Amino acid sequence: MALYIGVMSGTSLDGLDIALIEQSSAINLVATHYIPMPDTLRAELLGLCAGGPDEIARSAIAQQNWVKLAAQGIHTLLEQQQLKPEAIRAIGSHGQTIRHEPARGFTVQIGNPALLTELTGITVVSDFRSRDVAAGGQGAPLVPAFHEALFEERTGNRAVLNVGGFSNLSLIEPNKPVAGFDCGPGNVLMDAWIHQQRGENYDRNGQWAASGKVEPTLLKALLSDPFFVTQGPKSTGREVFNLPWLEQQLSCLPGFAAENVQATLLELTALTIVESLQSAQSNTEELLVCGGGAHNVTLMKRLADLLPNAKVASTATHGVDPDWVEAMAFAWLAHCCLEGIAANRPSVTGAKGLRVLGAIYPN
């Protein structure tokens, strides 16, 4: 039995998820801690994702601030659990993605793991995506292997859907290698639109989207992006889908009510998930949803409507808190790295083979 901490800061940039897991014959979530992202740091990270002048210095400063926030949260979690740093075998730190371009052979997550080791007194494993990209893979999604480890004992055809800033699927079917891929925007466009229009960070329960109606011409324009017809393995990010991308689509069309745009963005998320399942020829009997999207009542209902032959439910129905799956995954990936266990899945990322992921910063 060993204890690991996972730190995840996703594309939504709402905050840092910190999860403590116990790794033995099973994976158990022990405790969690969440730190909201300060507005100034969030704005700077968003700016780095978009690109601009003096990126090297700006990214160096931003990652120092990110690491200090992460270390603060880790110490708080340890204090709450009355644990000393020596009790933790390693921290799996994803860092913050500021650029993901596997077609050009690189992916960049900032997070200064050396400083995180110094500030916590705990070995840190980070840079999980680069090895898969170096092996010709997409470097994403990485969570399907973890989903497989969590749910491999279950029977039937199951898909695990993570809806964070972007949505990705893991297909777990008996006697088949796990499959997985990014579907497209999850919450990223809905969050950006409601923030621009109403100053809110997200659409609680999808209520604003539910107040509008889908605009077919806008939906058709959004779905015309080449990503949606690209065959997997594939991954995407803010480099492709962002507020300027949405505004460009809107500029070519007549004006729409703001709530109708939100409704259409939710429909885009739901449709691209379902079409991804269909293109994979998946006979999904159960769709388990995690990430922030699991709390979007309107999205969950729409997925259920579009998948009448599948049970659509939160991972909570299987005892796995939907808010902490990704942070748990990076704690588990740290375990895999230290044990020399390959944690990518070529059937998911397209890499040339199995690879041990992560770089180790020993305490």
From Swiss-Prot:
Pathway in which this enzyme or protein is active: Amino-sugar metabolism; 1,6-anhydro-N-acetylmuramate degradation; Cell wall biogenesis; peptidoglycan recycling
Keywords: ATP-binding, Carbohydrate metabolism, Kinase, Nucleotide-binding, Transferase
GO process terms (BP): 1,6-anhydro-N-acetyl-beta-muramic acid catabolic process; amino sugar metabolic process; peptidoglycan turnover
Catalysis: reaction(s): 1,6-anhydro-N-acetyl-beta-muramate + ATP + H2O = N-acetyl-D-muramate 6-phosphate + ADP + H(+)
Enzyme class: transferase
E.C. number: 2.7.1.170
Any one GO molecular function term: phosphotransferase activity, alcohol group as acceptor
Alphabetized Pfam families for the sequence: AnmK (PF03702)
Residues binding ATP: 10-17
KW Ligase (keyword) present: no
Keyword set includes Kinase: yes
Task of the protein: Catalyzes the specific phosphorylation of 1,6-anhydro-N-acetylmuramic acid (anhMurNAc) with the simultaneous cleavage of the 1,6-anhydro ring, generating MurNAc-6-P. Is required for the utilization of anhMurNAc either imported from the medium or derived from its own cell wall murein, and thus plays a role in cell wall recycling.
Full protein name: Anhydro-N-acetylmuramic acid kinase
Source organism phylogeny: Bacteria, Pseudomonadati, Pseudomonadota, Gammaproteobacteria, Pseudomonadales
